[in-house]
């Protein structure tokens, strides 16, 4: 069964380019920033499993998931 997901987008609205296909630490970190726990390099771009539409864009993901008290002193 195919796991749903999406290609996350960076601050420029572009997909994250990756060179090591499959298991990829960079992509895992990117996917965590976008609010999901796992991703990998597919077709030279990071793919995040279970990444929802609302979190594809990095700015949306930060708004939805960031817990930085300097950015959000009163929480969310």
Swiss-Prot record:
Domain LCN-type CS-alpha/beta: 3-67
Classification via InterPro entries: LCN-type_CS_alpha_beta_dom, Scorpion_toxin-like_sf, Scorpion_toxinL/defensin
Any one of the GO CC terms: extracellular region
Tissue distribution: Expressed by the venom gland.
Cited PROSITE patterns: LCN_CSAB
GO MF, one annotated term: sodium channel inhibitor activity
Subcellular location, principal: secreted
Keyword Secreted: yes
Keywords noted in UniProt: Disulfide bond, Ion channel impairing toxin, Neurotoxin, Secreted, Toxin, Voltage-gated sodium channel impairing toxin
Entry's localization field: Secreted
Cysteine disulfide partners in this protein: 18-41, 27-46, 31-48
Keyword Disulfide bond: yes
Notes on the domains: Has the structural arrangement of an alpha-helix connected to antiparallel beta-sheets by disulfide bonds (CS-alpha/beta).
Functional note: Binds to sodium channels (Nav) and affects the channel activation process.
The family this protein is said to belong to: Belongs to the long (3 C-C) scorpion toxin superfamily. Sodium channel inhibitor family. Beta subfamily.
Name of the protein in its database record: Toxin Acra III-2
Organism: Androctonus crassicauda (Arabian fat-tailed scorpion)
């Amino acid at each position: 069964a195919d796991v749903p997901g999406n290609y996350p987008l960076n601050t420029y609205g572009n997909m994250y380019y990756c060179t090591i296909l499959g298991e990829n630490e960079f992509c895992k970190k990117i996917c965590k920033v976008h609010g999901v726990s796992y991703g990998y390099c597919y077709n030279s771009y990071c793919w995040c499993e279970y990444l929802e539409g609302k979190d594809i864009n990095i700015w949306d993901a930060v708004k939805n998931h960031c817990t930085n008290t300097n950015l959000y002193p009163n929480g969310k």
